[in-house]
């Protein structure tokens, strides 16, 4: 498959909010936008093994797996129950927290059971910076939605990359705040990047690709 074309098509259709997603999935609370959700649903339509770092309540995880034949893996410590967008006012934050009495871990598991095939899903609770990724199979699609700090991204990606398949799509969320970690790793490891697509936004934009995406096809 031409992964570069698949990425560009997924971005185009995601921008139009065209995917297999229904309104119930779009209603899952998450710090993201509908365009990102639709993009993930489209990108995962090719199947394979999908890893998501930082699943929170399952907005992007459920979007990625819904209607797709993927083996999906999620990792999160579920330690931030009141996670909110960086730039919201106190008034908007209070509004966003309405009807969020269910803790993130419980909410995530409920959403996964509702919208996914639990026989094709594994969820690990823990620190993604110290997780033993060698226990995982080779990864075809990776969505990093963890901390945007250089250290967290660098340490985590260094651990994940050895588990990449022959061709892996790496998606970095919050690309507006690119720390430079992936670029340093690409240089250090001599990684072969056959396609690179950067999507920038005005920042935390519900009508666009939220806070940007960095998308890479990395070949071994």
Where are these regions (language model features)?
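S-adenosylmethionine/decaboxylated-SAM
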Residues: 6, 10, 23-26, 37-220
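N-terminal auxiliary segments of SAM/dcSAM-dependent transferases
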Residues: 1-2
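N-terminal pre-P-loop "Q-motif" helix
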Residues: 32-36
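Class I SAM-dependent transferase core
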Residues: 12-31
């Amino acid at each position: 498959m031409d992964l570069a074309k698949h990425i560009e098509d997924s971005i185009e259709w995601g921008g139009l909010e065209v995917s297999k997603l229904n309104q119930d999935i779009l209603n899952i609370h998450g710090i993201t936008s509908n365009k990102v959700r639709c993009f993930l649903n489209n990108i995962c339509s090719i199947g394979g093994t999908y890893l998501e770092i930082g699943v929170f309540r399952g907005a992007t995880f459920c979007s990625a797996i819904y209607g797709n034949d993927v083996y999906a893996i999620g990792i999160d410590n579920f330690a931030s129950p009141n996670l909110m967008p960086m730039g919201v006012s106190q008034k908007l934050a209070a509004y966003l927290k309405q009807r969020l009495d269910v803790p993130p871990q419980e909410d995530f598991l409920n959403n996964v059971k509702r919208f996914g095939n639990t026989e094709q899903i594994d969820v690990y609770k823990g620190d993604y910076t110290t997780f033993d990724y060698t226990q995982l199979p080779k990864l075809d699609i990776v969505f990093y939605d963890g901390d945007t700090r250089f250290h967290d991204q660098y340490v985590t990606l260094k651990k994940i990359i050895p588990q990449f398949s022959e061709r892996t799509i790496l998606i970095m969320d919050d690309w507006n705040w690119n720390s430079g970690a992936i670029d340093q790793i690409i240089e250090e490891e001599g990684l072969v990047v056959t396609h690179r697509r950067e999507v920038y936004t005005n920042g935390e934009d519900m009508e666009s690709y939220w806070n940007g995406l960095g998308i890479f096809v990395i070949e071994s």
